[in-house]
Amino acid sequence: MLINFLLVGFGASLGAMLRYGISIFVKSKWKTDFPYATFFINITGSFLLGFLVSTALGPMWQLFLGTGFMGGYTTFSTFKVESMELKWKANFQVLFSYVGLTYLCGLIAAFIGIMLGV
């Protein structure tokens, strides 16, 4: 049982570090109101998690990669906070684009990941 917690924890720490690195890189390249870093992370995360759940990985790999790594990599809470910040700035065009594209592209990416993993 302890090994399961270690797998999830180690995977999550790696995923969070990758998310942080991508976020720093993207924010340094594109100065815009649209949260491209979080958008990219969540869309690629949707694809990768879709792929992972549709493959025949063993339960330990699922814990490490699916629950751990992907849980640390993707960020639903940052998506919500950035959405609220756009609302508070009254930047409704970017807000609705961000929310709509995140959900639509996330579903499409997850579907493609699942189809490729089958």
Curated annotation (Swiss-Prot):
It comes from the Bacteria. It catalyses: fluoride(in) = fluoride(out). One of its GO terms (molecular function) is metal ion binding. The chain crosses the membrane at residues 5-25, 39-59, 61-81, 98-118. The keyword Transport applies. GO terms for biological process: cellular detoxification of fluoride. Keywords: Cell membrane, Ion channel, Ion transport, Membrane, Metal-binding, Sodium, Transmembrane, Transmembrane helix, Transport. Na(+) binds at residues 71, 74. It is found in: Cell membrane. The keyword ATP-binding does not apply. GO terms for cellular component: plasma membrane. InterPro entries: FluC. HAMAP family: FluC. Belongs to the fluoride channel Fluc/FEX (TC 1.A.43) family. Fluoride-specific ion channel. Important for reducing fluoride concentration in the cell, thus reducing its toxicity. This is Fluoride-specific ion channel FluC 1. It comes from Listeria innocua serovar 6a (strain ATCC BAA-680 / CLIP 11262).
